Amino acid sequence: ADVYITSGYGVGCKLLTVNGNQVTDVYRNTVMKNHHGGVVKLGDYLYGYSDGPGWICQNFKTGEMVWNNKTFGKGAVAFADGRLYAQSESTGEVVLLEPSPEGYKEHGKFILTPQSTIRSQRGKIWTHPVISNGKLYIRDQDLIHCYNIAK
């Protein structure tokens, strides 16, 4: 079984293979330095935000960066129905992305409105987008937004 680990603060990522009592290091690098927004694995690729290069696609097997994009800021990501839902922790911007190793492919975006008035001026939206039964849920402190994303 493969075990992938990632952390922020300059630590980076690591892929291990576990076979019974034997653990083998596959790679360790600083391509994916994900603080707390999570990553999504689809096929042989990982998608998420890495401190420094921004939103990235990483080859799961080799650890190499496939592409990066700094169009919008650090945040969390979720996946449903063939799309990535990425949310900026600072601005409340939500972006719909096509997961592709061919490059950053944006299919729409919006700004979360209204946003919480109790969040401090430097406060962040650290909750992950949640998708269930055709609905996208986004929480900002005391507010929960629900969007119908069913096809």
Locate predicted features.
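Noncatalytic, solvent-exposed loop/strand surfaces
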Residues: A1-K151
